[in-house]
A protein has these predicted regions:
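Amphipathic terminal alpha-helices
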Residues: 232-238
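Conserved Rossmann-fold NAD(P)-dependent oxidoreductase catalytic core, especially the SDR/UDP-sugar
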Residues: 76-106, 121
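NAD(P)H-binding glycine-rich loop region in Rossmannoid oxidoreductase-like domains
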Residues: 40-70, 99
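Adenosine-cofactor binding site in Rossmann-like domains, unifying the SAM/SAH pocket
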Residues: 26-41
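C-terminal "lid/loop" region of Rossmann-like NAD(P)-dependent oxidoreductases
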Residues: 151-153, 179-180, 188-195, 199-219
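N-terminal Rossmann NAD(P)H-binding glycine-rich loop of SDR-like oxidoreductase domains
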Residues: 3-22
Length: 238
């Protein structure tokens, strides 16, 4: 296949890009220094994997206009290319859409699901992580780097980037359209993960406004396609 991966220099995008190359596909990447808002091409791709986005919540608070520009406005040329050329599109959504009104990131991902062309799949990623990667899930990274200062009683659905890649690879070959969750359906308590990583001694913060007590993916649709996660976060840490 001829595949375009946006955000191919990012955390998830770099893994997806390398996977498709290793599988023998013709793969183009589109990322910094290019501007998605200026995206134009005469090439005919078989698949677009749109992973370019800004997930920095602090920036969303400090500069919401720029955040909207990056995640919503600059997605328009990508989606329009797919719509006009009837190209299948897999795009990054987020578990944040389930309470999209809480922060600007969730809002932009909810809008992406509305923007997306008919022949597309919105992938609602949960807490994506990988060992020793600076752009991994923030809480996981803080525990790994020993920089966390407190814990919470929350449970989170941490999904390894390798499982994300395998889900995307499967969806690339399927004819599924719509939106679906990509996670493990096996949430792990922050306290349990911290204890396994030698950080269980930290104080517990009881009040965390705006955060869900538990996140848990419903992976029924992916399981119907033959996918299941293979990595449990508690098995990857020491």
């Amino acid at each position: 296949m001829k595949i375009l991966v946006t955000g191919h220099l990012g955390f998830i995008g770099s893994h997806v890009y390398e996977h498709f190359i290793q599988q023998g596909h013709q793969v183009d990447g589109y990322d910094i220094p290019h501007d998605l808002g200026d995206f134009k091409t005469e090439k005919k791709y078989d698949l677009v994997v749109h992973l370019a986005a800004n997930a920095a919540i602090r920036e969303a608070i400090e500069n919401p206009d720029a955040f909207w520009e990056n995640n919503v406005t600059k997605s328009i040329p990508i989606f329009e290319y797919c719509r006009k050329n009837n190209v299948r599109c897999l795009y990054a959504s987020s578990a944040s859409v389930y309470e999209w009104w809480i922060n600007a990131y969730g809002i932009t991902k909810k809008v992406n699901e509305i923007q997306a062309p008919p022949n597309s799949v919105g992938m609602r990623f949960f807490n994506v992580y990988a060992e020793k990667v600076s752009r991994s899930d923030m809480l996981y990274r803080m525990l790994e780097d020993k920089t966390a200062t407190y814990l919470t009683r929350h449970k989170r659905d941490w999904v390894h980037v390798k499982d994300i890649v395998s889900a995307i690879a499967l969806l690339a070959e399927s004819d599924y359209t719509g939106v679906l969750d990509v996670g493990t359906a096996n949430p792990v308590a922050v306290i349990d993960l911290a204890t396994k990583m030698g950080m269980g001694h930290l104080p517990i913060k009881e009040e965390t406004p705006g955060e869900r007590d538990i996140t848990c993916a419903d992976i029924t649709e992916l399981q119907k396609l033959g996918w299941s996660p293979t990595i449990n976060i508690l098995d990857t840490v020491k």
